[in-house]
Amino acid sequence: MKNKEYIKTDVVIVGSGVAGLFAALCLPKDKDVLIITKENTNECDSMLAQGGVCVLKDLNDFKCYFEDTMKAGHWENDPDSVKVMIESSQEVICTLIDLGVKFDTDKNGEYDYTREGAHRRNRILHHKDETGKEITATLLDIAKQKENITIVPRTTMIDFIEKDNVCQGIVCEDEYGEMGSIIARDIILATGGIGGLFLNSTNYPHITGDSFALAIKHGVELKDINYIQIHPTTLYSKKKGRRFLISESVRGEGAILLNEDGERFTDELQPRDVVTNAIVKEMRKYGTDHVYITLPTMNTEEAAKRFPNIFDACMEEGYDITKDRVPVTPAQHYMMGGVKTDLYGRTSMAHLYAAGETACNGVHGKNRLASNSLLESLVFAKRAADVIANDNSEKKEDYNEVDLSSYPAKEERQKEFKKLIMDEIKEKDKDFYDKWCNIQG
């Protein structure tokens, strides 16, 4: 059948993570906002973010924070993007606090800033070891109460509706296989990364880069699509499924990495790609598929309080991280590249925006600095929302009628999308592809 019935709204946001939710909440109340999300609203990678969220504590830290971000990114970052993110950090963190987000405090009631790999100073706010969950759940609860925001779970974007490089909406499919169209003045892509395409990833398996595949199909510009972060420390397990992250904040609190002989072999607080390479070198040296992590600076009670989820996950596998050597191994974690945007989330297609891990404005360069992901999502989602809110230009609805019967079945579509993305990565960086992408999900 052809698309004669459709939903019409002001803004459609694809994704219910931090970027999508914060963008929705930053839009004015007179904008009707429709959020669709691929699975249940709580099944997004933002919920999994453990370590924390960076903030510029004071102006004296600006130069150091800027340099730490640039150095971690191998100086391939866009400096303007980095400046905007850092300069906007205090504002968005204050907004989160006003919305009810709780960050941990020390015994004096002051915010407890921690430090992670490649940070020279403590500048990371956290909520135990579930900072992403605290932020995302708070934003989600507020969004559900807003009359102008509607959230539709278990609905997948399968195409853009566009003509002459102007986006008019999206085609989507619900959990029952029913297809439909959403026509909107503005569209924000916030679908996360591509972890679901890998055999070993910290991401949810349904995070499969749909926005990237559709961008390729429709000629929307991508940037640094081969810049994919492998996190050095995920809990080693023979079980299939998503890999459990052992947050970098554990190493920030004194955890050390050991090889098969029980020897330290690297500076644990180097950038993620450096630590990952050091681990891979040790695994090859000993012919193993893991190394070990242990946290000698805390006792059991302290670790259980500071890192409750990590502590429990290790205990379920039979390890007390404060006493035992816990096996860890690298796994795909984050996408630095993505749909190319400017500093306001605008893509190369009119009225199509991208935010969060889906977007790439160059802020992370070749390797993301720990705990910059939540901050980046918040800062640039707000900037995209601000542009949409202040855009009073006329937009003509002009698009070809959508033939819903022309779309392939779900399994065939997923294979097509995966091939589009992997071929693009292979073309950009065959060495990375051969090393990591040949081991796919």
Where are these regions (language model features)?
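Short beta-strand to alpha-helix junction loop
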Residues: 79-90, 123-141, 152, 202-209, ...
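An anion/pyrophosphate-binding glycine-rich loop and adjacent beta-alpha core
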Residues: 41, 214, 220-320, 387
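Conserved redox-cofactor binding core of oxidoreductases
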Residues: 98-178, 190, 234-237, 257
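A glycine-rich dinucleotide-binding beta-alpha-beta segment and adjacent secondary-structure elements
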Residues: 152-153, 158-167, 172-173, 306-360, ...
